[in-house]
Amino acid sequence: LIAGLDNPDSGRVLIDGIDCTERTPAERNVAMVFQQYSLYPHMSVKENLAFPLKSRMVSVTESEINQKIDATSRTLRIHHKLSNKATELSGGEMQRVAIGRALVRNPNIYLMDEPLSSLDAKLRSELRVELTRIQRDIGGTLLYVTHDQIDAMTMATHIGVLEKGKLIQFGTPRDVYDQPSSVS
């Protein structure tokens, strides 16, 4: 609904207070990160990071693209991998590139669907901390979908609990944990 890939049954979709219900996905300035990395294997890390900035809908100079790639790759600690092909990276590095592709766009909202679930426990823990830090530093809205209670409780400022497609509870992690509205 937020990305515009489906229409709401009722109500409106507001992003930064603007009604986006009738806008196309491309007009919503939403970045998405999935569980699977979705990288272009024939491209380098730098080319993968630059790809969303080369859209006809975005007006960014080559100098700005290079600045954004440099800053983002340093933030994600993949700067030394910019010339590598995506196929030469570890799973954690590939996921960092996927996250970086979202970050370079500076969207109104980041949608992340289980971005850490396919990673090993150590890397998952490291990226959990890193994503929380990045979200705090950029101050953007990050909607993070997860089935992992640790991800939800340690990363969220607010949690929405869905059951059969319906929102059954919304609150702080502490409120949701201490006063669950459903125990099913």
Question: Which sequence ranges carry the predicted segments?
Answer:
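ABC ATPase nucleotide-binding domains
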Residues: 29, 39, 44-184
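ABC ATPase nucleotide-binding domain signature region
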Residues: 17, 25, 29-36
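A position-specific signal in ABC ATPase nucleotide-binding domains
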Residues: 6-7, 54
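Helix-to-loop junction immediately C-terminal to a conserved catalytic motif
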Residues: 3
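Intrinsically disordered, low-complexity regions of eukaryotic proteins
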Residues: 8-11, 95
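Conserved ABC transporter NBD signature motif
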Residues: 11-18
